[in-house]
Amino acid sequence: MQLAVRQEDADILLKQKNVLDELVVEKYRVAGQITQTALAYITSLINNSYHLQTSPKLTIQQLCLLTDSFLLKLLSRQYVNKVNEKGIAHPTTINVNQLLNGFSPEIDDEREFFLNQGDVVTISLGVHIDGYTSQVSHTLVIYPPSADAKPEGPLLGSNADALCACHLATESVVVLLGCSLSPEKLPANLKNVSNTVTGSQIRELVDAIADSFNCVVVPGSKIRRVRRFLAGQAEGIVAERDFKGVVWDESHQEARLLKQSNNTSTDLILSDSNKPVQTNNSSAIPTDDFVVVPGEVYQIDIRMTGLSDVNEIGIVTTEEIDHFTGKNNKQDFNAKSSIFIRDFAVTHQLKLKTSKKLLGEIDRQFSVYPFKLDYASKNFPINTESSEDEIKQQIAAIGQDMKSNRLGAAELSNRHLIQPKPIQTTKFIPLKEILLSANPTGKHGIDATKPVLPGMEIPLPNLGVSSLKLKSLLKTGRSINNVRESTTVAINENNQELIRLTGGEATAKSNWVHSQYKLPASLNETIGQLVQISKDKRFGIKIKEVVPYKVQQSNMSVESMQID
């Protein structure tokens, strides 16, 4: 269903409000600075708790709650009474090992989740100011505790391969997007006839890096344009008009396996440069036929998994888990979805007083962005500048408020007024299990519970395997770890610079890892040229990184904070 919107209003919302003028760039910059500061804050909490052990170990629930409170504290000091909306665009999630998305347990969860040595931990968070969104994801490695803050040796194995590939791919794409300001500076191996940066170039570069490290790009990875109030927060619920971006799903692994059966080379192979490229795409279906244009903002969100521990050919896919999973004879991990998003296309007359109160709070505070139930507590956010004892008391008070919030959320969810965002894990399914399975209905069965973008409902089109059939094959698969790096960049045409709003060396330093793989010569040369372009201040691309605020921290509390 498409809403009836006047063309004049659509132009204002989708075009005029997304022009990167000085005011809009400043809103993006401040949102990026807040996001960067929060990432540094939660990284410090983890280091103090698990690496340096200068404070008691914090649970994942406490880490998420403290970071969300810290985000709101920073937001409250910016654009006071100057914008109508500002808030958390992506609740803090901490996904460990095979967990991919959405794991942010509430503080009233009876189980205590701790991090362990050797875990790969992905932190994701984000904020928006007046709808201009900044998000970040960064993967950390939990090393054995050490007094000098330095591990005894690098991480090895498939996790190290994935971390290397993910870091290289993210940094390369950042520079590649910046080359849209001066396409003549593109490396020779990446140039095309139209002398532009296209979606096909982006996909081929990322896939070539993944293949070189024996990795797979996990379904759900994307490099997409971000616009005001449109940052992918409702994918699978609302189809976004004029979608522009590169998206990976299982069908691309299928095509990759077909290609590898004929060619085992991992060299960078470009598509036909004479193929016409679309610059205007009004469809909601993702396609690689687009051109990166200066004046746009992009979210780079790459997730990878290493295959060095896997001795067979197969497909990496995702599985949605809930609180019913694992309650049979299999001891699978189970958890309740804790992140919700409001569906404004649905209305219903509610019966419970708690439901009406909660819905009013949601409509007033959270807009079109995801939220957690503890956000609606009268004791949220926690004052992170309080003493540790006071912080623990505030956390306990929020846990008490969660009882009524859960009761109200149950009716809202049953009436589809709010939609839970699923918790996803990565799984590896052997190809032989897919080929030997019976598939009488073909590819016509669609899993309505799995959030996918339009046009990607059939995961394996060449094999004729539907999403329902692939879901039934998950029991034959095995869990596999994943890593993730995400950054937001703004291509500022006015100052001829690429502004990196999140990530980078300031807050998302690469982990100490060692991979047994290396880049082939041609790909190594291409990436080397991209690095040279980013470092050359005179003839290269100007890349400006947003740095975090200066924060002095003591265990859970913040002692002082300097805001520009």
Swiss-Prot record:
Its main location: cytoplasm. The gene is ARX1. Keywords: Cytoplasm, Hydrolase, Metal-binding, Metalloprotease, Nucleus, Protease. Belongs to the peptidase M24 family. Gene3D superfamilies: Creatinase/methionine aminopeptidase superfamily (3.90.230.10), Winged helix-like DNA-binding domain superfamily/Winged helix DNA-binding domain (1.10.10.10). Component of the nucleoplasmic and cytoplasmic pre-60S ribosomal particles. One of its GO terms (biological process) is ribosomal large subunit export from nucleus. Pfam families: Peptidase_M24 (PF00557). Transmembrane segments: none annotated. It is found in: Cytoplasm; Nucleus. InterPro entries: Creatinase/aminopeptidase-like, PA2G4/ARX1, Pept_M24, WH-like_DNA-bd_sf. One of its GO terms (molecular function) is metal ion binding. One of its GO terms (cellular component) is nucleolus. This is Probable metalloprotease ARX1. The keyword Cytoplasm applies. It is an enzyme of class 3 (hydrolase). Its EC number is 3.-.-.-. Probable metalloprotease involved in proper assembly of pre-ribosomal particles during the biogenesis of the 60S ribosomal subunit. Accompanies the pre-60S particles to the cytoplasm. The keyword NADP does not apply.
